[in-house]
């Protein structure tokens, strides 16, 4: 298991949930957190603890985003009109690395960020190597020609453990995806319950 894979599963163990729905997640085999004290019984969380956990889970799901980066995304969601929690999900799902992951071009969101950073993806015909790049409805995301036969791509496309959501149209033969619309919380196929309203409460304290 690579260092990055180990780090990813550490998030699962910390949360006590298989947040990406992966068959190899260690929480499928045990119900305690990482480290030598992981088997200690956990007490009931305070309201703050519940809010913090919701934030850490959402932040971890999108590739264990840095706090400064995640807080900036929240700040923009809060500035926009409408429901802040829905805005937050919409902004996170509009990230290029999230769309590459949702389109099943790669197996994990961590791999998606690295894949984008290494220049394997174009948006509307222009190479983009920034995972946090924000896509708009109608944008066309394509795996670059030289990258379409990479093993990581071919294996990801064949994975049956997750489906492409209906707000993204994908042609896996051409390795092209169209970001149809910005989704709402109910549209997003999270394997576990995400509670962005608790994230709003956390940052609104």
From Swiss-Prot:
Family membership noted in the UniProt record: Belongs to the universal ribosomal protein uS4 family.
Gene3D superfamilies: Ribosomal Protein S4 Delta 41, Chain A, domain 1 (1.10.1050.10), RNA-binding S4 domain (3.10.290.10)
Full protein name: Small ribosomal subunit protein uS4
Protein encoded by which gene: rpsD
Keyword ATP-binding appears in the UniProt entry: no
Bias kind Basic and acidic residues: ranges: 1-16
GO MF terms held by the record: rRNA binding; structural constituent of ribosome
Keyword Plastid appears in the UniProt entry: no
PROSITE patterns: RIBOSOMAL_S4, S4
Function of the protein: One of the primary rRNA binding proteins, it binds directly to 16S rRNA where it nucleates assembly of the body of the 30S subunit.
Superkingdom classification of source: Bacteria
GO CC terms of this entry: small ribosomal subunit
InterPro entries documented for this protein: Ribosomal_uS4, Ribosomal_uS4_bac-type, Ribosomal_uS4_CS, Ribosomal_uS4_N, S4_RNA-bd, S4_RNA-bd_sf
A biological-process GO annotation: translation
Span list, region Disordered: 1-46
Key words, A-Z: Ribonucleoprotein, Ribosomal protein, RNA-binding, rRNA-binding
Domain S4 RNA-binding: 94-157
One Pfam family this sequence matches: Ribosomal_S4
Subunit structure: Part of the 30S ribosomal subunit. Contacts protein S5. The interaction surface between S4 and S5 is involved in control of translational fidelity.
């Amino acid at each position: 298991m690579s260092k990055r894979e180990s780090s990813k599963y550490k998030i699962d163990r910390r949360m006590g949930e298989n947040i990406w729905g992966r068959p190899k997640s260690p929480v499928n085999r045990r119900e305690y957190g990482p480290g030598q004290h992981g088997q200690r019984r956990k007490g009931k969380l305070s309201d703050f603890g519940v809010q913090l956990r919701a934030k850490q889970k959402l932040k971890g799901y999108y590739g264990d985003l840095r706090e400064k980066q995640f807080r900036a995304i929240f700040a923009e969601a809060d500035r926009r009109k409408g429901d802040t929690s829905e805005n937050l999900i919409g902004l996170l799902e509009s990230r290029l690395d999230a769309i590459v992951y949702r389109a099943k071009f790669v197996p994990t969101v961590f791999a998606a960020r690295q894949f984008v950073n290494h220049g394997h993806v174009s948006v509307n015909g222009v190479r983009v190597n920034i995972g946090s790049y924000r896509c708009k409805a109608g944008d066309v995301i394509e795996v670059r020609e030289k990258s379409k036969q990479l093993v990581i791509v071919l294996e990801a496309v064949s994975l049956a453990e997750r489906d492409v959501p209906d707000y993204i149209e994908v042609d896996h033969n051409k390795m092209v995806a169209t970001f149809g619309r910005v989704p709402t919380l109910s549209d997003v196929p999270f394997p576990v319950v995400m509670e962005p309203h608790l994230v709003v409460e956390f940052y609104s304290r």
